[in-house]
Swiss-Prot record:
SUPFAM superfamilies the record matches: Trimeric LpxA-like enzymes
Origin superkingdom: Bacteria
EC number, as in UniProt: 2.3.1.117
First-listed, main subcellular location of the protein, grouped into a coarse class: cytoplasm
Record pathway: Amino-acid biosynthesis; L-lysine biosynthesis via DAP pathway; LL-2,6-diaminopimelate from (S)-tetrahydrodipicolinate (succinylase route): step 1/3
Catalysed reactions, as listed in the record: (S)-2,3,4,5-tetrahydrodipicolinate + succinyl-CoA + H2O = (S)-2-succinylamino-6-oxoheptanedioate + CoA
Listed name of the protein: 2,3,4,5-tetrahydropyridine-2,6-dicarboxylate N-succinyltransferase
Family that this chain belongs to: Belongs to the transferase hexapeptide repeat family.
GO-annotated cellular components: cytoplasm
Protein's gene: dapD
Any Pfam family: Hexapep
Length: 274
């Protein structure tokens, strides 16, 4: 792995000249293909948790960006669609039954996953879009018309409901993608973007929009935080009233309660939201 990282880092330093050096390009393409395949298999990932903190592996982002720079678009076809892209689909008309059985995943028509996205066992993918660099851990459901952005990280046993947008990011290199930790529920038509972290066991109601500058308000105390939904929080959309009379209130999201891990396991999602 160290040699792979070294080659990517060296290529990044001369990225603007790569297309002018055909011999260097041939060697580099194999390195980049190996990097994308490592993402595909989940042996490397863009972002990972170390010592209770999430860290970005910038070299992986560089590998993805270099792959875009050095790869020409080509025509792809399946049984009902054609498209022209630099990134091959993870699954195509040529993917056989045994591949799906060995991966222990289920997909339905309209599920689009780009190569370089990792899909763990027992994941169900409804008609949706999962971009390169994304990581979907075991037992998660990606529901209908959800969008998982490039490099977004989704934990184990999550439910990403219909029409939800999970933001991704390739640049700037140091920026974290959206991270949804284990056992989270993201309600339908919600949008989580700009590197927000939703910690383990959190429940996000339907139609909640959270970016890096969205005020996250504890209902009980009035405390305001940004960029992070604490573990086992139950979150709904809300409005912060204006201090000045006659001025409009501003959108926020509200932590209406926090439950412990045991309660979260026992109580149905709908009961928590009510």
């Amino acid at each position: 792995m160290s040699s792979l990282i070294k080659e990517v880092e060296e290529a990044w330093q001369i990225k603007d000249k790569l297309l002018q050096d055909s011999s260097k390009l041939i060697t580099l393409k194999q390195t980049l293909n190996d990097s994308i395949e490592s993402l595909n298999q989940g042996t490397v990932r863009v972002c990972e948790k170390k010592e209770n903190s999430w860290h970005v592996n910038e070299w992986v982002k560089k590998a993805i960006l270099l792959y875009f720079i050095t790869t020409e678009s080509q025509l792809y076809n399946n049984n009902y669609n054609s498209w022209y892209d630099k990134v091959a689909p993870k699954f195509s008309a040529d993917t056989d039954k045994n591949t799906f059985k060995e991966a222990a995943i289920r997909t339905v028509p309209g599920a689009i996953v780009r190569t370089g996205a990792y899909i763990a066992k027992n994941v169900v993918i409804m008609p949706s879009f999962i971009n390169i660099g994304a990581y979907i851990d075991e037992g998660t459901m990606i529901d209908t018309w959800a969008t998982i952005g490039s490099c977004a990280q989704i934990g184990k046993n999550c439910h990403i409901s219909g029409g939800t947008g999970i933001g991704g990011v390739l640049e700037p290199l140091h920026a974290k993608p959206v991270i949804i930790e284990d056992n989270c529920f993201i309600g339908a038509r919600s949008e989580i973007a700009e590197g927000v972290i939703v910690e383990e066991g959190a429940v996000i109601s339907m139609g909640v929009f959270i970016g890096s500058s969205t005020k996250i308000v504890y209902r009980d105390t009035g405390e305001i935080i940004y960029g992070r939904i604490p573990a086992y929080s139950v979150v709904v959309p809300g409005v912060l009233p204006a201090k000045e009379t006659g001025k409009p209130g501003l959108y926020c999201v509200v932590i209406v309660k926090q439950v412990d891990k045991t309660t979260r396991a026992k109580v149905r999602i709908n009961d928590l939201l009510r």
